[in-house]
Amino acid sequence: MASPQELACVYAALILQDDEVAITGDKIATLLKAANIEFEPFWPGLFAKALEGVDVKNLITSVSSGASAGPAQAAAAAPAGGAPAAAAPAESKEGRRSQGESDDDMGFGLLD
């Protein structure tokens, strides 16, 4: 889990990107000081160095569009597979049930 200092640096970098300002350690530190956030002095420089040469706006838009395109691509590919693709999940469900039932018979209990 990210620390509050890390999250503050991320938000500061996003604010700078939204305002189309170059992301530097000094500017991140200035934003954090203006927000009265206590932070270790290495965090702003670390985030600025990590984001150096990275188009943050493009990164954000490509991540969000990739997540929404995934289900659409899967739905488009499903009709091409036809009935054999539909039969495979039914077999795997039956296999899971029999495997789950066999695990129940083993007698392993938490408090035995």
UniProtKB/Swiss-Prot annotation:
GO terms for biological process: cytoplasmic translation; translational elongation. Keywords: Ribonucleoprotein, Ribosomal protein. The keyword Ribonucleoprotein applies. GO terms for molecular function: protein kinase activator activity; ribonucleoprotein complex binding; structural constituent of ribosome. Residues 71-112 are annotated as: Disordered. Residues 91-100 have a biased composition (Basic and acidic residues). Pfam families: Ribosomal_60s (PF00428). Transmembrane segments: none annotated. Residues 71-90 have a biased composition (Low complexity). InterPro entries: P1/P2_N_sf (IPR038716), Ribosomal_P1/P2 (IPR027534). One of its GO terms (cellular component) is cytosolic large ribosomal subunit. It comes from the Eukaryota. HAMAP family: Ribosomal_L12_arch. PANTHER family: 60S ACIDIC RIBOSOMAL PROTEIN P1, LARGE RIBOSOMAL SUBUNIT PROTEIN P1. P1 and P2 exist as dimers at the large ribosomal subunit. Belongs to the eukaryotic ribosomal protein P1/P2 family. Plays an important role in the elongation step of protein synthesis. This is Large ribosomal subunit protein P1.
